[in-house]
Amino acid sequence: MNADAKTEIKGRERYKAGVLKYAQMGYWNGDYEPKDTDLIALFRITPQDGVDPIEAAAAVAGESSTATWTVVWTDRLTACDQYRAKAYRVDPVPGTPGQYFCYVAYDLILFEEGSIANLTASIIGNVFSFKPLKAARLEDMRLPVAYVKTFKGPPTGIVVERERLDKFGKPLLGATTKPKLGLSGKNYGRVVYEGLKGGLDFMKDDENINSQPFMHWRDRYLYCMEAVNHASAVTGEVKGHYLNVTAGTMEEMYRRAEFAKELGSVIVMVDLIIGWTAIQSMSEWCRQNDMILHMHRAGHGTYTRQKNHGISFRVIAKWLRLAGVDHLHAGTAVGKLEGDPLTVQGYYNVCREMKNAVDLPRGLFFEQDWADLKKVLPVASGGIHAGQMHQLLDLFGDDVVLQFGGGTIGHPMGIQAGATANRVALEAMVLARNEGRDIAHEGPEILRAAAKWCKPLEAALDTWGNISFNYTPTDTSDFVPSVTAA
């Protein structure tokens, strides 16, 4: 692109031409210095052959703010210079020819307060199907404090949840009921009881268990809460079960949540696929009713997994913290689901830190101040077992829920034994860590020593000790070493 093609055309000349390049319409400004109140989006773009990357970046800025395909005279009726998003930086993606990181700044006035639906309608509403781009991915986003303060965030938060459960200094343990579909209400409740009695803190509905012919939702809630109450009485610990209230309408979701509350549940669950407005609505209900809100990220892989097109999960995690969830499935790194260890740690940092620093290896391109918004408790779930306890504790620390579904329900000695194996493995590993031992390297030895006194743990290690899912992650962090928010 020549210099003239990058220079904004102003005044009457602007409105004589029917079609101008986006850079000429003012959507590119290489000298722009983002304001503290600007929202900044980092896109990975793959322009079509022959499309200049600066023009492609300007097109992204234009189509995600005020532009259309031609000049419109009604621009003159607005403060268009303020309302236009501004692409201000383009960097080649290291080691990936034809792809570029482009930085786009948006004035805060473009967005409705406290609405993820409005934010996403602008940022991702149109540009991802734009013909001049082969592909586009939203890699990261800096949310200005003034905008963050318009959201209420998680209804409970990590600190209050731990106080309610009276459990501190170690990860929480959970399991997803298996098989996820097909059990009767009574058998489902028995699985819940066995897991909780064996030592777990939580049991969980899976993403697609709602109200099917084989088990009506009311039956499941009744049997599950009977199991929770019985296990709590037997163990003397506060227990819970994530009751999935996901349904076809908000009215039905509220109906189910109210019934869960009447039964004494401390937590309800929704799936990501219900949409942003529904998520924020359920978060507000939980805030008003002192309930913990668990978020299952069902469906996220359809747009987060591929590196060249879609949305990074770190951005989804940021939006969900704003929207207000207390728990969020954020990957395991060592389990069966996609996840590079450093990238997954970046997701956890988004959930748990009060201020994120720039951390390029973990995919965090911007500083992010969360303005006292409560923390989200990440959940590690999917293909993990007791033999990986040292890796999980070393990677993620204490503030995490470790959920062993198959690693509990599939134990050769039964469900309760599976839960006990996980509890003993965790307690042994936390004790070793607190004594100053190097659990990352001594973990297998520590587990085997504990297994001498715990037959369920011994059986778990014999069954799964060598099981791992060693695949090359598709989503790893690419970065330019000099990248900063400016």
From Swiss-Prot:
Mg(2+) binds at residues 204, 206-207. The modification N6-carboxylysine is found at residue 204. GO terms for molecular function: magnesium ion binding; monooxygenase activity; ribulose-bisphosphate carboxylase activity. Binds 1 Mg(2+) ion per subunit. The active site is at residues 178, 296. One of its GO terms (biological process) is reductive pentose-phosphate cycle. It catalyses: 2 (2R)-3-phosphoglycerate + 2 H(+) = D-ribulose 1,5-bisphosphate + CO2 + H2O; D-ribulose 1,5-bisphosphate + O2 = 2-phosphoglycolate + (2R)-3-phosphoglycerate + 2 H(+). RuBisCO catalyzes two reactions: the carboxylation of D-ribulose 1,5-bisphosphate, the primary event in carbon dioxide fixation, as well as the oxidative fragmentation of the pentose substrate. Both reactions occur simultaneously and in competition at the same active site. The basic functional RuBisCO is composed of a large chain homodimer in a 'head-to-tail' conformation. In form I RuBisCO this homodimer is arranged in a barrel-like tetramer with the small subunits forming a tetrameric 'cap' on each end of the 'barrel'. This is Ribulose bisphosphate carboxylase large chain. It comes from Sinorhizobium medicae (strain WSM419).
